[in-house]
Amino acid sequence: MNFQAGGGQSPQQQQQLAGGPPQQFALSNSAAIRAEIQRFESVHPNIYAIYDLIERIEDLALQNQIREHVISIEDSFVNSQEWTLSRSVPELKVGIVGNLSSGKSALVHRYLTGTYVQEESPEGGRFKKEIVVDGQSYLLLIRDEGGPPELQFAAWVDAVVFVFSLEDEISFQTVYNYFLRLCSFRNASEVPMVLVGTQDAISAANPRVIDDSRARKLSTDLKRCTYYETCATYGLNVERVFQDVAQKVVALRKKQQLAIGPCKSLPNSPSHSAVSAASIPAVHINQATNGGGSAFSDYSSSVPSTPSISQRELRIETIAASSTPTPIRKQSKRRSNIFTSRKGADLDREKKAAECKVDSIGSGRAIPIKQGILLKRSGKSLNKEWKKKYVTLCDNGLLTYHPSLHDYMQNIHGKEIDLLRTTVKVPGKRLPRATPATAPGTSPRANGLSVERSNTQLGGGTGAPHSASSASLHSERPLSSSAWAGPRPEGLHQRSCSVSSADQWSEATTSLPPGMQHPASGPAEVLSSSPKLDPPPSPHSNRKKHRRKKSTGTPRPDGPSSATEEAEESFEFVVVSLTGQTWHFEASTAEERELWVQSVQAQILASLQGCRSAKDKTRLGNQNAALAVQAVRTVRGNSFCIDCDAPNPDWASLNLGALMCIECSGIHRHLGAHLSRVRSLDLDDWPPELLAVMTAMGNALANSVWEGALGGYSKPGPDACREEKERWIRAKYEQKLFLAPLPSSDVPLGQQLLRAVVEDDLRLLVMLLAHGSKEEVNETYGDGDGRTALHLSSAMANVVFTQLLIWYGVDVRSRDARGLTPLAYARRAGSQECADILIQHGCPGEGCGLAPTPNREPANGTNPSAELHRSPSLL
């Protein structure tokens, strides 16, 4: 059955699509408030009931462990975002809907953790993540809905992502049904929407059944929303989906603020009147411990750089142009030609129409702040011919160009220029410095610098001399003149341009007439008024003019008397790097060139400011490191040396997790790194994984193990001689004379170690590692399993346990029965910190890539994390 979305709606459905939600579905604020109060007040009675049940547990150790977990849950509830998050932190609320076959859970999991999980979550989930839009951080609330959209869901969301599987017809039909249901509760024009088709389940046994035309037809029926095809297995377009939907929400909010009028008291994040019991997000295990790429840096690899103030002001006019256009608009853009001859009102009208079309282009990616068709002089051929290029300027400091609009949309054959290492020049004049406001006399920015950021990563062609990837560019600073100051000395004009042809020579050597102060006065006017300075005839110049006429496709009269030809051939600007590389571009009008030049200058300024802010972040990082070291000092027992009780110790033993005085640290160094890894608390660097170990342990915990059986011995004091301290330290750590005894058990030490990891018992783990041999600490979970304690700690994303196990000799290269290393478990658990530790110590990564294919999963569909949940019962 071929499903035709949008066809055959009932009158009621048509009314819902056109006029918004019926009145009877209006959500009562009073009822929502009462429901939220009831939900909130019901939490603590249930927690107190759990405490009463805990008291009935006879095993005191188990009782204390459960109590600690409940206390942690209670603290997390009491300190939820509604009570602690600053009012200045804006939120973006995104709902994900689709049936169980859509692949939406895998899409969300890939975005949050960078890994692929095949199972679909029937109950959905609630997740949080930081996302950056236009240089500002937002708290992204992701609500994976387990069923169709309900009234409370519709009132909560800022945007909706509809998900279906390209190999499942039912999931495709479900999308439109869910859309109609959403429209019955909420006006569709108020909610940005994105349609996603997932490729995860496509295989030889499950071929694709939804072709591209049907999917795009559905996206048109869904209020012309953007359509993406994603693959959670390899991460295709996953990041782009969430970045795009966030940009749509931000753009819609700014558009609504502009519609209200200028008001400085507007809140950063609009509040919704509906609050319900289901709006408290739950914590996901893979979300809590991810600290990598990146932490969350990898997930935010498309984070935009800090935009300049001038860009924000200039982009206000077309802030609504944030959604990716439909294929109809793309086709109409291809038929336009902005280089045709125009006169009078027709010129202005057609120019604005062409610019509107250009600014609305963007297939499946964020809209650049400026884009359009320019002529670019080739740097490869001998004749230096001019060719049309589709040029885009993004707020990440990159200027990109493609042979055609089609290549740009397909993201192929593109080259990029890093503006941080360049400057922009106009042959024949010295440019003013970029300023936030529009220069007087220039035309309005009809191109409307859009707020949206481009996440596109363009692959530069190899061997092109103008490709930014072909050389390391060191830029020249932008010109520092703040305004056009009239005629300048001739020498300054000579230095402000790149002389490479007869035409450029004429522009570079021409002096401006007195009184000409406006920067929009192009070199063409100077040339036409100064015939004495024309250069000698050059065959290269004639060929250049001929090629330009040919490339524009518009016949023009030849001869020096044609002012139109001279004007159209002189709107050139050059991007120059300090290494001597040049990129020559030409616009169709002087106004368009001014827009491009000022936009490029603004991006150069923003890139330079971004470098300065990076230094500020480094300084701030040093302050944070000092605070972290201070946190280590405040750990229980760390006020005194672990061996001699000297006050205020400032040296540390990493694998012991303890602090010591400088004299004892010298003795520890002689023990060897296999017994004590010494580091200065103030002079050395402290990466996060080492700080985690030090703050988790401390002198009190360490001495409860290493001095757990002192008997009649007494430890030396701060004033004891060095020989006495050394005898004590060697007896304590080398001979292990005072080591606390192991608890009586028939279970082998290696199996106890596995249990300690699963039960998250740090003191028992340290004791077992101190007693165990290398063979015992490397004992596996079972003969047919092959997992070591390091596999389990990596699967639990436990950074402290992972680091301690490696220090005490657990083999990082060990593999389980399926050939997976601990690194594979860490990556599947979404822990970048554990993965970094394992890689640093030589854990192999083959067979455990970031995007495992579905056939690497077990036959029963489980993964290591799921097996881990059964580990306590198996142990």
UniProtKB/Swiss-Prot annotation:
Q: Which tissues is it found in, per the record? A: Widely expressed.
Segments carrying the region annotation (Disordered) are: 1-23, 428-568, 853-875
Q: Does the keyword Nucleotide-binding apply?
A: yes
ANK repeats, residue ranges? 748-777, 785-814, 818-847
Top-level division of the source organism's lineage: Eukaryota
Identify the stretch(es) annotated as Small GTPase-like: 84-375
Q: Which GO terms describe its cellular component?
A: cell periphery; cytoplasm; glutamatergic synapse; nucleus; postsynaptic density
What name does this protein carry? Answer: Arf-GAP with GTPase, ANK repeat and PH domain-containing protein 3
Organism equals: Homo sapiens
Record gene name: AGAP3
